[in-house]
Amino acid sequence: NKAHYALAGLEKQGKLKAVITQNIDGLHQAAGSKSVYELHGTIMKNYCTRCGREYPLSTIIESKGIPRCQVKDETGGVCNGIIKPKVVLYEEGLDDNVVSGAIKHIRNADMLIIGGTSLTVYPAAGLIRYFSGRHIVLINKAPTSSDSMADMIIREPIGETLEAIVCE
């Protein structure tokens, strides 16, 4: 949507260092963003729960029924493990490398733009506490528990708002 393309445009202009998202759909990369931290994983990458082999999304889409790993094991048999998306389900831990990368970017930012989130899902909502830069801009239609931390609050759709910023 417009927000994904606007963020990619800001990155291309050198004004955005990273996108930190809870979305698992891969749309930030599809829009052109390069530095994306997917806190809850992605459906674009999939893996065998038994042997760990990685598979593209097409394997899931083209599968009839539950996708199974067809890799031959050391005995010549087929692995047959279930192939599932690399996503974080409720009560599962987040990837430490993704979280530490996100924290690094938040700590080093002079401005933090938070958009399209109610800031209620933890631990992602708690990442705001790592920001020590100058300005927080919050773009969300409804109030959040972090509104008091924001220097600017915009209660408009995020796509149109970011698109207007990129065009100026």
Labelled PLM ranges:
Residues 1-168:
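Conserved catalytic alpha/beta core of Sir2/sirtuin-type deacylases, generalized to analogous enzyme cores
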